[in-house]
Amino acid sequence: MVRPPVIGLTGPNSSGKGKTAEILVEELGYAPHSLSDMLREEARRRGLEPVRDVLIPLGNELRRARGAGVLAELLIERLCPPALVDSIRNPAEVEVLRRVPGFVLLAIDAPVELRHARSLERARPGDARTIEEFNEKEQRENTADPSAQQLAATAALADVVISNSGSLRDLRREVLDAVERCGH
């Protein structure tokens, strides 16, 4: 099977991007990269705790100051195919990554109630405890501000949308099928 040289992942919080990344890395040998890692590095450089409630405004600040595709611009030089880019949250990041020949964007999604339940299970610092708080945080990630997170607009650019509302086995099958369909 011919595989895309660079695969990008986008999707809302707790949709299964991490599990999708594991499948691509462990089963297909993709080298993992994350735009969030670029933010974590910047947060640490500034002496900030690299948690979601710090990273989101930091990312918005960087996009305003240096352009909406800045995180992808910083990462693109580190990519050596086969590579996986996780945490794509702005259409300008997709635009930058589309400069890589054969780049494919996968959007991972699941119903909000299931994603909230997954979020509670993983219990990361700063994760929403109530469904109301979860929805509120999600609304903040879907803004019209070109320098902010625009998850819905980013997902709309996906080459393939994967629904992750079933089992891990189902997700694995969907991911491998998507990679095969997108291979060149």
Regions found by a protein language model. Give the residues of each.
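ATP-dependent NMP and nucleoside kinases share a basic, alpha-helical "lid"
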Residues: E27, I76-R124
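Conserved lysine of the Walker
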Residues: K17
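P-loop (Walker A) phosphate-binding loop of NTP-binding proteins
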Residues: P12
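Hydrophobic positions on the alpha1 helix immediately C-terminal to the Walker A/P-loop
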Residues: T20
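Small-molecule kinase domains that catalyze NTP-dependent phosphoryl transfer to phosphate-bearing small molecules
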Residues: G69, R122-E174, A178-R181
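Extreme N-terminal, non-catalytic leader segments
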Residues: M1-P5
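ATP-dependent small-molecule kinase phosphotransfer cores
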Residues: Y30-V96, E132-N135
